[in-house]
Amino acid sequence: MMFTLHRAGPADVADIMLLETSTFGSDAWSPAMMLADVAQPHCYYLVATSERSSELRGYAGLLSPQGAPDADIQTIAVAPDARRHGLGRQLMLALLSEAELRGARRVFLEVRADNPAAQHLYDTLGFTSIGTRRGYYQPDNVDAIVMRLDLAHGAAQKAEAGSDD
């Protein structure tokens, strides 16, 4: 399965929210929160469509102010039928490349402790666990594992070359 990525804008938020609510349920962002983040100049959001249709198959967002040393993966979601086809990796690599272009030296993220598939993806990209935020995801009271990737020049390309997907 092949996917096309493009920069998300306000017009994409309705489709993003369909996947957001079906993926994250009680943890889902509100439409207003998503719209504010997508429209924010320090954020970079991508949407992915299947090459066979224009239907949204995934999205991901990065907070990375130009020149700031730290960036944060805000969110990532992949539709169930598009999982295990490399789309999560493709989205993450694109965000890591953008973080590098904006001058970030470190990228952080939080991942649910009960999501081993996402944890594995982040491990293969070179992220390491640096701590736990107890009860971070509410109302489910699920812990968040905090992860960090120290970027070196070309880190995204190196991660892509080392892909096991």
Which residue stretches match the model-derived regions?
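Conserved GNAT acetyl-CoA-binding A-motif
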Residues: A99-E110, R133
